[in-house]
């Protein structure tokens, strides 16, 4: 995290992250950048680009990317896959615009899935995405 956040986290250090990866550890980035005006999506995109990540796993309050807000439109269609450019062009706001552009320009795909799904994070880490894969 970019700030002190209790016993379960450490302050972000690129060197410490690289050391953790070298030791085969699974690391989570939390807390965004620690600066106002930047979302947690942008923070994770920044860290993923810095660390040359293969992809970003985004656990959200929604279970994927939809063509419209499923809370408003009961007929909203969930995408299994979509490109970042399509997300931007269609103004699908599940991932913020800055993070989307950063990921597109740096060829970092994303997987969007529900934070509330049982074993959702573990499944996503195993490549079993029950959500939307957003390709760069």
What residues fall within each predicted segment?
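C-terminal catalytic "cap/lid" subdomain
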Residues: 1-136
């Amino acid at each position: 995290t970019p700030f002190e956040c209790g016993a379960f986290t450490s302050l972000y250090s690129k060197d410490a992250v690289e050391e953790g990866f070298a030791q085969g550890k699974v690391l989570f980035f939390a807390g965004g950048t620690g600066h106002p005006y930047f979302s947690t999506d942008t923070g994770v995109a920044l860290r993923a680009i810095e660390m040359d990540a293969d992809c970003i796993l985004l656990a959200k309050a929604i279970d994927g990317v939809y063509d419209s807000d499923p809370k408003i439109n009961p007929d909203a269609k969930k995408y299994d896959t979509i490109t970042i450019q399509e997300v931007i062009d269609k103004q699908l706001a599940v991932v913020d615009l800055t993070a989307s552009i950063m990921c597109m320009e740096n060829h970092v795909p994303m997987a969007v899935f529900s934070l509330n799904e049982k074993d959702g994070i573990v499944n996503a880490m195993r490549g079993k995405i029950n959500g939307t894969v957003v390709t760069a």
